[in-house]
């Protein structure tokens, strides 16, 4: 659980973890994919939970770079003393994580067949799929968070109830932005909903968060439209504008 500390203390937030001592910090960045909704400060942040599974097969694909199409495959690496190739990944909305499944191994093989059929043969995956025998494959399954517009949610977090109250005039006139202070949850930042594109969005998101946290007064290096498009408050503004 995440709790605000008394204003007199040096820390702004207390993190309580079952069976462990509490942690205290001035700055907390929530980078927990779909699990951020377990925290009271983020229960109303809307996004979809998406299950994804990767597949790892024995064999060297000899790639020097990642190939990407319907799916992707990364260059081979040594895993537990054996050269193996990892590829994927499935995309199933509103499904939980858990153990890898043979059906999703097959999905990954079928995706690879569309983008790199030669690698499919090289690794013996065609025969494996035809026989339905996946015992030599390993996998990893987890969940992603994906938001409306396939854009991540990155930036400082505001108190939703107070935001909706202070800016309620927007319900009557979307252009009439009240001269009110945004009720920030000071020291609390969010980085989630990177979906299946985290390798692209995470680096610039980290830079933006750094500048927010360090109190940069000039964020002009980033397009204003970008900051607005990924900001957590966009959902609260949308609630008001469209009277949701």
What are the functions of these language-model segments?
Residues 79-128, 133-136:
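Conserved FAD/dinucleotide-binding core of flavoprotein oxidoreductases
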Residues 17-68, 101-105, 120-122, 126-127:
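Central helical "cap/lid" subdomain
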Residues 1-13:
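A conserved short coil-to-beta-strand element within the FAD-binding core of flavoproteins
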Residues 14-18, 193:
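Short beta-strand segments that buttress and anchor functional surface loops
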Residues 2-5, 73-75, 154:
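A structural signal for short hydrophobic beta-strand segments in well-ordered beta-sheet cores
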Residues 128-244:
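C-terminal catalytic lobe of FAD-dependent flavoproteins
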Residues 58-88:
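Conserved FAD-binding catalytic core of PHBH/FMO-like flavoproteins
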Residues 39-41, 96-98, 200:
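Short glycine-/acidic-enriched loop or helix-start segments at secondary-structure transitions
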């Amino acid at each position: 659980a995440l709790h605000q500390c008394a204003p007199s203390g040096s820390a702004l937030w207390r993190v309580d973890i079952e069976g462990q001592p509490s942690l205290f910090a001035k700055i907390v960045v929530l980078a927990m994919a779909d699990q951020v909704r377990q925290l009271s400060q983020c229960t109303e942040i809307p996004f979809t939970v998406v299950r994804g599974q990767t597949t790892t097969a024995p064999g060297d694909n000899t790639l020097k770079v990642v190939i990407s199409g319907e799916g992707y495959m990364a260059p081979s690496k040594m895993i537990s003393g054996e050269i193996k190739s990892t590829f994927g990944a499935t995309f199933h909305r509103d499904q939980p994580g858990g153990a890898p499944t043979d059906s999703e191994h097959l999905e990954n093989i079928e995706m690879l067949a569309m983008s790199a059929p030669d690698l499919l043969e090289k690794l013996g995956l065609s025969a494996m799929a035809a026989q339905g025998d996946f015992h030599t494959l390993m996998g990893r399954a987890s969940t992603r968070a994906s938001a409306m517009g396939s854009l991540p949610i990155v930036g400082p977090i505001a108190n939703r109830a107070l935001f909706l109250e202070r800016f309620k005039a927007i319900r009557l006139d979307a252009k009439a932005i009240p001269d009110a202070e945004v009720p920030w949850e000071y020291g609390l930042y969010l980085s989630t909903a990177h979906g299946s594109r985290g390798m692209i969005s995470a680096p610039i998101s980290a830079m933006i968060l750094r500048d927010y946290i360090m109190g940069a007064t000039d964020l002009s290096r980033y397009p204003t439209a970008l900051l607005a498009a990924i900001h957590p408050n966009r959902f609260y503004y949308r609630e008001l504008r469209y009277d949701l």
